[in-house]
């Protein structure tokens, strides 16, 4: 679970909510039969034999796939019976066997970001997504004016060498998130997908 739009502003929640997942494994994964759920009573069983996500691929699960209604999001699969609270909620992806594949519990801005019209997105797919500190607010505008990167790298400018040394995540801000990503790169070898922004001293070495 890589990005969550729980509270769109350009359209109503009933048509504009979406969830982005990414396949961080090395194998194709068939999502048919998997369950989208929260800790209450909302569940949706994915029913599509062709819904296969390849290694490194992003996929958008959304409440509506009409671009003219949903804020301009290309949705890969439409779910029903599952809604995202604007305050706190859970997004849980469950294997047909009952095993939890992934889960995120966001918390009304206590540790997770929570801004109207902006998705909350994982800083790096290699980070633990159950920790709010590893998420940030989207800064890229899409569709009708909300902010997010549905179906794309959360920081699409990471591969552009723009001289912003130290801006590890390429979001044009210099803050603690850059420090967290740099330390994570050193200790856990999960580095940002960029070519130059992590080069703090401009020596072309990372």
For every predicted segment, state its role.
Residues 1-132, 138-147, 152-158:
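Activation on beta-sandwich/Ig-like modules and their edge loops
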Residues 150-206:
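Cellulosome-associated attachment modules in secreted, modular CAZymes
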């Amino acid at each position: 679970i890589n990005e969550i739009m729980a509270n769109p502003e350009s359209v109503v929640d009933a048509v504009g909510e979406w969830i982005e997942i990414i396949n961080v494994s090395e194998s194709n994964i068939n999502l048919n039969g998997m369950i989208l759920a929260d800790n209450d009573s909302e569940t949706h069983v994915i029913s599509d034999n062709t819904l296969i996500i390849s290694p490194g691929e992003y996929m958008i699960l959304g409440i509506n796939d009409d671009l003219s209604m949903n804020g301009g999001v290309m949705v890969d699969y439409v779910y029903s019976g599952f809604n995202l609270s604007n305050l706190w909620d859970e997004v849980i992806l469950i294997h047909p066997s009952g095993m939890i594949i992934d889960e995120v519990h966001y918390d009304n801005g206590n540790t997770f970001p929570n801004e109207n019209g902006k998705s909350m997105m994982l800083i790096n797919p290699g980070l633990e997504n159950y920790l709010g500190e590893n998420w940030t607010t989207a800064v890229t505008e899409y569709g009708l004016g909300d902010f997010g990167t549905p179906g794309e790298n959360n920081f699409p400018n990471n591969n552009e060498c723009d001289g912003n040394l130290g801006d590890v995540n390429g979001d044009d801000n210099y803050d603690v998130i850059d420090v967290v990503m740099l330390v994570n790169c050193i200790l856990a070898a999960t580095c940002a997908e960029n070519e130059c922004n992590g080069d703090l001293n401009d020596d072309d070495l990372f």
